[in-house]
Amino acid sequence: MKGSLSHELEVSLPADQLWQVYSTLRLAQLSAELLPTVISKVEVEEGDGGVGTLLRVTYALGIPGMKYHKERFVKIDHEKRLKEALFVEGGHLDLGFSSYLIRLEILEKGHNSSVIKSTVEYEVDEEHAANASFATTDPFMIIGGAVSEHLLQKKSNCSIMLL
């Protein structure tokens, strides 16, 4: 069984500023730093943040049924501001999913606003079809909100220092 889910989060930041975080390892670092109750640790197992990079994401205690996942960056398109990562171990794969792909896009909406579009494409074995309900964009919505809030706060602090 195949499926896909998407979520859009509008934020008051320029697309280029968001992409500077989303296109690099900084997104993973900030995710663990800003959301320790969701992600306890992110380790780079291979690569430098480009295509082919392999991350091990360890979930905080209390995430039912999942302890960690490994994801490989399979696409980074700077022109389209698009990044894709494929789960290669753990996480949803331990729940009967045969494929779990995350797509993150930063869409320009205006001079100082953009949209973070999070998409999950998955395939789950028929015998585990009931587990399709575990597919979700919620973590990426939470991460997007935390990262954009962090960047806005940083921007605000810089403005205050200039006064």
From Swiss-Prot:
Q: How is this protein annotated for GO cellular component? A: cytoplasm; nucleus
The active site is formed by K83
* Pathway the protein acts in: Alkaloid biosynthesis
Q: Where does tyramine bind?
A: Y68, H69, K70, E71
Field pH dependence: Optimum pH is 4.
Q: Which GO terms describe its biological process?
A: abscisic acid-activated signaling pathway; alkaloid metabolic process; defense response
Keywords of the record: Alkaloid metabolism, Lyase
Which cysteines pair up through disulfides? They are none
Q: Which reaction does it catalyse?
A: 3,4-dihydroxybenzaldehyde + tyramine + AH2 = norbelladine + A + H2O
EC numbers on record: 4.2.1.-
Record's keyword annotation contains Chloroplast: no
Family to which this protein belongs: Belongs to the BetVI family.
Please report the name of this protein according to its UniProt entry.
Norbelladine synthase
Q: What is the lineage of its organism?
A: Eukaryota, Viridiplantae, Streptophyta, Embryophyta, Tracheophyta
